[in-house]
């Protein structure tokens, strides 16, 4: 084992000097003598000095401390032994339930699958959430982004998706908590436990109180575990909450490594780092990874470099809107801004496609008329426009839905709505079958039959 000594510490970045002929390679893991702290080599500065990131707290480090080169990259446990466990960035269990005992370890730095190994799928993944299944359907083996500013419901949507898909899909899932609140990680663990799906989920946490090195690498740790399940021939779900914190950790590290910042202070390697992560999240001929990623949007600005870079990698984008949340409509998904490559008559069928487009056209017409209504009132509209507004308001309310994971807050039991029910309901509203019902009947219900029942109690 090669040994070196610390020559400089600046926050999470540590410079270590080795003998010139024993200089570690980039991404080698170094271990601090007499401590659990792992350092990952990022740059070779020459003359035997390497610049590393500390994957843990760098408190108490001082010059002259001895460091050992393991001669290998960071390796984490993979396989079924990781299911039901909570691990950190290094794959160390943090749930106080003893060692993982996995038979296999795998490096967190892997090459993306070769072009000829990839496979495309058009099979739909039903989520049971009306607005998502209708206007931005997910593909099995696809990549989905949940975009939203602070407090519009990304994590709640994510938890509902995990609950619905984990229960209905009955496959394995990996959840990577990247720089999010520890409380949410705890809530999520108990939610999985109560739903009896914990034995199918591997949890990897690097929360917001941890150093930037942990937050930068924890997404790769979760991805490595998911890749192993995929390579075994399984269909696996990978949830990342939140991909923006991965970028932000990269920004913190980049500045400490001495790189010049680019637009809005982001790292100059933003597109490359994101690309390297996203290209590994893909489906091959042996198995599939369906990935759902929450993306924080700074100051609700979708043109910010971080969310803008993420957009290009996704098959479906679910955009959460503060305006819709302020109306009390949850999930606050914007049906006009959200898109999916699967919304194609050849994939979803003509009925689904035409219903989704009719819903969007009606909502778009209402959006255009809103200014006129605000200035002149409803009476100035033509009869056709009045009808369009009435239907749009019903659609808007019918897009809301009570969630299972929010039941403890709202007291309303959650609803899972099958795709057939969703299409039937919206088709009926658009074609005018339910024009006689009051719009309140459509708010926070599951299928259309519930809305009809609710209308009877309102009359």
Curated annotation (Swiss-Prot):
Similarity comment text for this entry: Belongs to the ATPase alpha/beta chains family.
Protein name: ATP synthase subunit beta 1
Keyword set includes Transmembrane helix: no
Subunit structure: F-type ATPases have 2 components, CF(1) - the catalytic core - and CF(0) - the membrane proton channel. CF(1) has five subunits: alpha(3), beta(3), gamma(1), delta(1), epsilon(1). CF(0) has three main subunits: a(1), b(2) and c(9-12). The alpha and beta chains form an alternating ring which encloses part of the gamma chain. CF(1) is attached to CF(0) by a central stalk formed by the gamma and epsilon chains, while a peripheral stalk is formed by the delta and b chains.
Reactions the enzyme catalyzes: ATP + H2O + 4 H(+)(in) = ADP + phosphate + 5 H(+)(out)
Organism for this UniProt entry: Nitrosospira multiformis (strain ATCC 25196 / NCIMB 11849 / C 71)
EC number: 7.1.2.2
Residues given in the record as ATP binding sites: 148-155
